[in-house]
């Protein structure tokens, strides 16, 4: 490698001198590594535009530092994009913006109040009220609940049947009401007795003979309960979820605000430059693996094969989800295995230069409590990996990805088992279990719509778990069988377990929005 770099370094030094710049050997080596994949003609073109960019920076001295080179390369890679627009970004869950619904103007407004892990006691109810407000406003817009209008001389009663949403206080103020529909939190205030609760009160439910719609109805989720109310009890005929809403319809109530997170002040979903890049970059892929046990030698060998195989065609990112070791307390063991992970890519120079390696911890990985959002693996444990693979990024769980205009949520959680253990009614059609799973989180607009005892969340950072507006792709790292399902323009993908599924993983192709099933085969003897 050094032999190849030597003439290129000389070429860089001479070109910079002709333009009035001086460059140190370590900086010329850095630039040579960036230009090495190109042929001679392309290298000359890049050198020309880089020196022109450096001249436009109006440096204070003729000495070109590493920061100036990186700025020039980044700006040239973003030609055609506006300020703040990035092709690919990892978004920390603790930086996701929080919005509150303003009932008066019927819009979501950015909440700029500071947030903290040990927050005020009032947030225990406030975060659930905000989740309720989000579901209420989209439910009231749905065709089944929106006020009827006269169209072409046809009266409201001749059109499709409409429902009027009732609040708990409306039912509690009367002794009987037929065909009542209530939106609220499904909760068990007394043992064996379930209630639907909203900010105005709670109503006891009689679920005997109730017809359950598709999905997992767990305590802690929001439901639409339809039935006849009499003497303080709602005899439920049907129990369903709040209706899902396409992302395009939801975004209209946020204006141009960046609801996704990241550095851009506006939402990148409508960027013409990024849309064009997304369309033309047909070879770009993102690789997802879950349950990557670095303490198992066979897993390390399969990862080595994966890295070597992708070195000739590097993906945009490789996302590895935990647990990374069996031990939850031995921090030194995890550091040792992360160092070894960096060593696996020792000969994969193109992969390390062009691919982001993203590590998403599970609840079993050390240093953070089992509460969502979960903090990333500490940098001190991944120092060796960060040195060996500089493009490594330590992510929160969950985290968000932005590729061009596409929005991707990544979460490592065994959620299917939690749903199955806590649901009031198990779906009868078990062959479509993945459809029930996808419908539950899409309709709830939340990653973990279950009781806080089953999955605690940080109250102040609950918006990081929202799925509203719906993203393009939700990637769950669940150890159950892999699947994918599309709901209202959103694809829900479960990667399955890398260890338990004969080393299978998923490859997402953003240009076509398709998912490929891949597997690392046994090497031929």
UniProtKB/Swiss-Prot annotation:
Broad class of where this protein is predominantly found: nucleus
Superkingdom of origin: Eukaryota
Sorted UniProt keywords: DNA replication, DNA-binding, Nucleus
Keyword Transport: no
Pfam family, one: DNA_pol_E_B
Protein name: DNA polymerase epsilon subunit 2
GO biological process, one term: DNA endoreduplication
Gene transcribed to yield this protein: PolE2
One Gene Ontology CC term in the entry: epsilon DNA polymerase complex
Assembly, per entry: Component of the epsilon DNA polymerase complex consisting of four subunits: the catalytic subunit PolE1/DNApol-epsilon255 and the accessory subunits PolE2/DNApol-epsilon58, Chrac-14/DNApolE3 and PolE4.
Disruption outcome: Pupal lethal. Results in smaller eye, leg and wing disk, brain lobe and salivary glands. Results in defective entry and/or progression though S phase during the cell cycle in eye imaginal disk cells. Results in defective endoreplication in salivary glands.
Subcellular location: Nucleus
Family of this protein: Belongs to the DNA polymerase epsilon subunit B family.
Function, in words: Accessory component of the DNA polymerase epsilon complex. Participates in DNA repair and in chromosomal DNA replication. Has a role in the entrance and progression through S phase. Has a role in endoreplication. Essential for viability and tissue development.
């Amino acid at each position: 490698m050094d032999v190849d770099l030597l003439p290129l370094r000389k070429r860089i030094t001479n070109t910079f001198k002709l333009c009035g710049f001086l460059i140190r050997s370590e900086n010329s080596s850095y630039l040579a590594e960036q230009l090495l994949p190109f042929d001679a003609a392309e290298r000359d073109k890049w050198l020309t535009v880089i020196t022109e960019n450096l001249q436009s920076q109006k440096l204070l001295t003729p000495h070109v530092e590493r920061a100036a080179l990186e700025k020039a390369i980044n700006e040239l890679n973003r030609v055609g994009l506006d300020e703040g627009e990035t092709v690919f970004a990892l978004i920390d869950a603790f930086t996701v913006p929080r919005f509150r619904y303003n009932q008066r103007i019927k819009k979501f407004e950015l909440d700029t109040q500071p947030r903290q892990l040990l927050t005020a006691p009032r947030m225990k109810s406030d975060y659930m009220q905000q989740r309720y407000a989000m579901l209420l406003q989209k439910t009231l817009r749905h065709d089944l609940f929106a006020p009827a209008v006269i169209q072409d001389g046809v009266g409201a009663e001749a059109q499709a049947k409409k429902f009027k949403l009732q609040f708990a206080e409306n039912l509690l103020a009367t002794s009987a009401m037929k065909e009542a529909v209530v939106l609220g939190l499904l909760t068990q205030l007394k043992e064996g007795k379930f209630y639907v609760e909203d900010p105005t009160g709670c109503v006891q439910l009689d679920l005997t003979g109730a017809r359950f719609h598709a999905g997992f109805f767990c305590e802690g989720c929001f439901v639409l309960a339809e039935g006849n109310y009499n003497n303080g009890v709602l005899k439920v005929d049907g129990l369903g979820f709040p209706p899902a809403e396409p992302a395009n319809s939801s975004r209209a109530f946020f204006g141009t605000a960046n609801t996704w997170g990241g550095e851009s002040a506006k939402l990148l979903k409508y960027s013409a430059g990024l849309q064009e890049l997304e369309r033309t970059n047909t070879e770009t892929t993102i690789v997802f693996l879950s349950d990557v046990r670095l303490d198992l030698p066979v897993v390390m060998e399969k990862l080595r094969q994966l890295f070597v195989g992708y070195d000739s065609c590097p993906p945009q990112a490789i996302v590895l989800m935990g647990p990374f070791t069996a031990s939850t307390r031995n921090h030194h063991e995890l550091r040792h295995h992360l160092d070894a992970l960096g060593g696996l890519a020792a000969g994969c120079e193109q992969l390390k230069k062009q691919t982001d390696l993203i590590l998403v911890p599970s609840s079993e990985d050390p240093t953070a409590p089992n509460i969502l959002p979960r903090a990333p693996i500490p940098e001190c444990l991944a120092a060796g990996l960060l040195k060996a693979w500089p493009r490594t990024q330590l992510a929160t769980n969950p985290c968000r990805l932005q590729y061009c205009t596409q929005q991707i949520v990544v979460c490592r959680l065994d959620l299917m088992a939690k749903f199955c253990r806590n649901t009031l009614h198990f779906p009868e059609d078990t062959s479509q279990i993945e459809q029930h799973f996808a419908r539950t989180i899409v309709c709830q607009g939340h990653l973990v719509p279950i009781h806080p005892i089953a999955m605690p969340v940080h109250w102040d950072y609950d918006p990081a778990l929202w799925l509203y507006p719906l993203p393009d792709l939700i990637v769950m790292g669940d150890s159950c069988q892999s699947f994918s399902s599309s709901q209202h323009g959103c694809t829900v993908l479960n990667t399955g377990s890398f260890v338990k599924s004969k080393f299978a993983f998923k490859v997402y192709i953003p240009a076509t929005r398709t998912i490929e099933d891949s597997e690392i085969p046994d090497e031929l003897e």
